[in-house]
């Protein structure tokens, strides 16, 4: 696994993992507070999104496990809390160096082309290309304001096109 709790910077690694596990925006994860985590419902409440609305992010068992292993810093309400003395009570800064290490371990060569927002693109593309989720599912998961934002990920693979063709044949022959 690319994200280990024993890494030098557990908060940074966990932050990066949460981006890929939720498809949330960088700011939604960085500004998450412990009071917004509902352990029973496995959700994270985001009081203010880019779209000016609140939203609920549903957390997987793995995401909950990652959150449970994070230390709570006294006097700091943030899930991804800075441990630096001069940043007491604030979230961590953008962990670009940690992200660089993750990208290197993953064998990604064009690291200059990859940013934190790329995680959202990766999540959306993975959901759409799996064939298990609709564009409306992607819209909801990523909190897109409109379906048009989600449509950019709707690229048909040759395998998917072949499956559609076979499915049509099966329907006609039935």
Q: Predicted segment positions?
A:
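C-terminal catalytic core of tyrosine-transesterase DNA break-rejoin enzymes
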Residues: 14-17, 21-28, 118-145, 152
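Basic, Lys/Arg- and aromatic-enriched nucleic-acid-binding interface segment
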Residues: 1-26, 30-31, 40, 50-54, ...
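N-terminal core-binding DNA-recognition domain of tyrosine site-specific recombinases/integrases
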Residues: 7-9, 53, 86-94, 110-115
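Catalytic-site neighborhood detector that most strongly recognizes the C-terminal catalytic loop/helix
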Residues: 48-52, 86, 142-167
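Non-catalytic DNA-binding core/recognition domains of DNA-processing enzymes
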Residues: 59, 95, 99
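Short, leucine-enriched amphipathic alpha-helices that occur as contiguous helical runs
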Residues: 11-13, 63, 92, 120-121
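Short, polar N-cap/turn motifs at the start of nucleic acid-interacting alpha helices
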Residues: 36-43, 112-113, 132-152, 163
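C-terminal secondary-structure termini that scaffold catalytic or DNA-interacting sites
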Residues: 69, 76, 81-87, 163-174
């Amino acid at each position: 696994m690319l994200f280990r709790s024993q890494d030098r910077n557990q908060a940074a690694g966990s932050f990066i993992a949460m981006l890929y596990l939720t498809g949330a925006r960088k700011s939604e994860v960085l500004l998450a507070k412990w009071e917004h985590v509902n352990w029973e419902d496995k959700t994270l409440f985001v009081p203010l999104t880019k779209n000016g609305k609140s939203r609920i992010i549903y957390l997987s068992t793995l995401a909950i496990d990652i959150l449970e292993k994070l230390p709570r810093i006294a006097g700091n309400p943030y899930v991804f809390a800075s441990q630096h003395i001069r940043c007491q009570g604030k979230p961590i800064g953008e962990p670009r160096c940690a992200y660089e290490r993750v990208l290197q371990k993953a064998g990604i060569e064009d690291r200059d082309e990859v940013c934190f927002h790329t995680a959202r693109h990766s999540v959306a593309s993975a959901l759409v290309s799996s064939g298990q989720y609709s564009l409306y599912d992607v819209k909801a998961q990523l909190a897109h304001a409109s379906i048009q934002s989600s449509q950019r990920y709707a690229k048909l693979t040759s395998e998917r096109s072949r499956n559609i063709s076979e499915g049509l044949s099966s329907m006609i022959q039935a």
